[in-house]
Amino acid sequence: MNKLITLILVCCFAFNLYAEQLPAKQFSHPERIRYDQHCFTIEGRDIFILSAAFHYFRVPQELWRDRFRKIKEAGFNTVETYVPWNWHERTMPRNVKDYSQCDFDDLKAWLKMAHEEFGLYTIVRPGPFICAEWAGGGYPRWVAKFCPAKYDTSFWLRSNHPEHMKWTKHWYDAVCPVFAEEQLTRKKSGEKGIIMVQLMESEKKEEVLRDMAAYCTNNGIEVPLFTCVTPEVRGSKDAVISQLFDMDNQYVWWNIQEAKSRIEDLKRQQPNAPAFVCELQGGWFSTVGGGLSEDSYLDGRHARGMALMAMAGGSTGLNYYMFFGGTNLA
């Protein structure tokens, strides 16, 4: 028994020593929002982030209040959405500095309703690549026009090629000011706002992450930036990347034991940030004339088991993906 206690103490000491060797996290407004290895702290209160995924672009605006009401009544304190570039800038601009084709009216209305009417925090995920079972992964079709001849379009999008990064910056320069206006740090004490912004989905190139982080901060983003299933972020000592934190995904078909072990792995690899599940999947999509979600859906007991096992592993943030699925209308 004494040997076991000694082993546990040695492991805890090594864990803390590793965390202390990593660059200290810097927060623009730590009195409003910050985090450590345990959880998020918002306005001085430790918060378990219980989030529901609900995508405004998949739901008619007339139904938003009904969906928000259900989310609130189910006990969630946060709502998450992707923000697809091809939804907001459908027509090709004249040049990279032209933002006249962007229309963010529905995004602004959705954020305002979440924050002011229903008192929910929000998490936004602007890509530019968003996966999300959405056409083109969120990229506008016109972006392919700028793909260099020697590249396959699917590989060029999500690359660190200068032309791709130029248009990625264009998108961030357009959408980040919308986020900046609605982020928690710009709101009065007690009001709700955006608490996190995600960089490109599953990005592996460090130079891309550094550039995208700069696109955010240069456009006034002050809340924490995160990535999703990006091991390069975990335990990074890079001056910029170390200020990001990575989240995990947990998929609908998994054995629930994996939920706990993956969270434990995340905490070991990233000991200076909270363990957060960006997508705790509760089902899958149906296709018109094809398979139904029920064909691959394990019932609510499985989703509940996944959530409990993630929390048993030490997770202090969960995003149910999706809480409300909606319909791809385009």
Identify what each model region corresponds to.
Residues 103-124, 152-192:
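An active-site-proximal structural segment forming one wall of the substrate-binding cleft
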Residues 215-217, 249-330:
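Catalytic-core region of carbohydrate-active enzymes that cleave or remodel glycosidic bonds
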Residues 164-237:
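Active-site neighborhood of glycoside hydrolase catalytic domains
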Residues 79-87, 125-135, 195-201, 229-232, ...:
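Short, solvent-exposed turn/loop segments enriched in Gly/Ser/Thr/Pro and often Arg
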Residues 19-78:
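N-terminal carbohydrate-binding accessory modules
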Residues 93-102, 127-158, 209-210, 241-246, ...:
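Aromatic- and acidic-residue-enriched segments that line the glycan-binding/catalytic groove
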Residues 64-136, 213-217:
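Aromatic-lined substrate-binding rim segments of carbohydrate-active enzymes
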Residues 4-13:
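Sec-dependent N-terminal signal peptides
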